[in-house]
């Protein structure tokens, strides 16, 4: 599923702002676009992926998305674009749809923005990035909401 959201944008939450800040820091990395790290953003809730997609669009990020509504051909196209396009550095993925059976080793940063009730599901999702064939160090960032507009990384 292409990550081009067209609905009106709600204001981003503190958690989404923290996520965008972290992705932006990674984007400002090496000069060569080829060397810039790719990020996978996992969420248990697809509505959260919608909100993150709005924020990424507003900041000009190119991204792909996989969730339970993605057909096999959409999943394949999203994975090929994410893995092969140096301009596409973010993959939004629901833990349920992308937690097993796919290879995301082109990424080196994993963001967990909505924890799954089963920690093993999160571990399997992280393993899509950190698996045999991975040539880079993998960083996992879990972002949890606090209160009064705060976020904890």
Stretches found by the model and what they are:
Residues 1-90, 96-100:
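Conserved Helicase C-terminal RecA-like lobe
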Residues 74, 89-153:
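SF2 helicase/translocase ATPase core recognition
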């Amino acid at each position: 599923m292409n990550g081009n959201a067209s609905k009106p944008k709600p204001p981003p939450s503190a958690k989404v702002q923290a996520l965008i800040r972290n992705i932006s820091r990674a984007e400002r990395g090496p000069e060569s676009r080829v060397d810039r790290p790719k990020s996978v953003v996992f969420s248990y809730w697809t509505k959260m992926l919608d909100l993150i997609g709005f924020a990424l669009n507003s900041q000009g990020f190119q991204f792909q998305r996989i969730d339970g509504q993605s057909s096999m051909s959409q999943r394949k196209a999203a994975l090929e674009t994410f893995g092969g396009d140096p301009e596409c550095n973010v993959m939004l993925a629901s833990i349920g749809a992308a937690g097993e059976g796919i290879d995301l080793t082109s990424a080196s940063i994993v963001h967990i923005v909505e924890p799954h009730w089963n920690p093993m599901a999160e571990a399997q999702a992280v393993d899509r990035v950190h698996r045999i064939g991975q040539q880079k160090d993998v960083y996992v960032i879990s972002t949890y909401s606090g209160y009064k507009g705060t976020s904890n990384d």
